[in-house]
């Protein structure tokens, strides 16, 4: 009797897994995150993987503030954050190509290797950053901003540090799960099988407006 129950449970698990795969869902906790990002053709999966990357970034950005870390540990951790930021950007592009939100519109314009948290205090790094800021000021003609007034927006990290934006992404993830489960969306009034897709321009306008509001809130 016990063996029959185990067999039935196994069959049910396989059936549920097949349904999840067909719907584009997967258990990210048990699956290795793909390195070939452009090969992920399911929007829900891409959003799930991006969410996992965002959580890793958040944990490491918090950890890099730890005053107990050595210079060696800070450099290693900063390298890891930069790699995750690069991966996050590739997921942004893939999600956009699959018809999802344009997350890249929330990001800063800075590209390349960046320093976070206490890594900015490493020997040689602080001097280099000060020199870069002075060069940028001369090129742009803008006034110099004292270090005490700098924030995460300046360093191109506002999209991952703004609480409101994180809530927006959580809401987006919840909406996707409801759509795949066939749960009606009270705000939009649609269910799976009768989906009204917003115009691309409307979605971009909404995301741009959200970005402006969040950045302005930080600067006020």
UniProtKB/Swiss-Prot annotation:
GO cellular component terms listed in the entry, alphabetical order: catalytic step 2 spliceosome; cytoplasm; post-mRNA release spliceosomal complex; post-spliceosomal complex; Prp19 complex; U2-type catalytic step 1 spliceosome; U2-type catalytic step 2 spliceosome; U2-type post-mRNA release spliceosomal complex
Gene3D superfamilies, per the entry: Helix hairpin bin (1.10.287.660)
Keywords, in A-Z order: Cytoplasm, mRNA processing, mRNA splicing, Nucleus, Spliceosome
Subcellular localization, as worded in the UniProt entry: Cytoplasm; Nucleus
Example GO biological process: generation of catalytic spliceosome for second transesterification step
Keyword hit for Nucleus: yes
Any one GO molecular function term: first spliceosomal transesterification activity
Alphabetized SUPFAM superfamilies for the sequence: ISY1 domain-like
Origin superkingdom: Eukaryota
Main location: cytoplasm
Cross-referenced Pfam families: Isy1
Family the entry assigns: Belongs to the ISY1 family.
Quaternary organization: Associated with the spliceosome.
Protein function: Involved in pre-mRNA splicing.
Protein name: Pre-mRNA-splicing factor ISY1
Gene: ISY1
């Amino acid at each position: 009797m016990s063996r029959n129950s185990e067999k039935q449970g196994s069959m049910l698990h396989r059936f549920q897994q097949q349904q999840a795969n067909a719907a584009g869902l997967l258990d990210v906790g048990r699956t290795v995150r793909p390195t070939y990002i452009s090969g992920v053709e399911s929007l829900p999966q891409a959003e799930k993987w991006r969410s996992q990357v965002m959580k890793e970034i958040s944990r490491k950005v918090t950890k890099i503030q730890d005053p107990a870390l050595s210079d060696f540990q800070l450099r290693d951790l900063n390298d890891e954050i930069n790699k995750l930021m690069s991966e996050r950007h590739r997921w942004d592009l893939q999600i956009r190509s699959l018809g999802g939100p344009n997350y890249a519109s929330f990001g800063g314009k800075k590209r390349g290797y960046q320093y976070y948290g206490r890594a900015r205090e490493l020997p040689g790094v602080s001097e280099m950053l000060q020199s870069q800021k002075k060069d940028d000021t001369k090129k742009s003609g803008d006034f110099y901003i004292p270090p005490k007034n700098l924030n995460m927006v300046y360093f191109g990290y506002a999209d991952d540090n703004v609480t409101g934006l994180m809530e927006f992404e959580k809401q987006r993830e919840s909406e996707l799960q409801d759509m795949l489960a066939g749960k009606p969306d009270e705000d939009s009034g649609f269910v799976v099988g009768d989906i009204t897709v917003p115009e691309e321009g409307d979605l971009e306008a909404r995301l741009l407006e959200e970005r402006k509001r969040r950045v302005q809130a930080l600067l006020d």
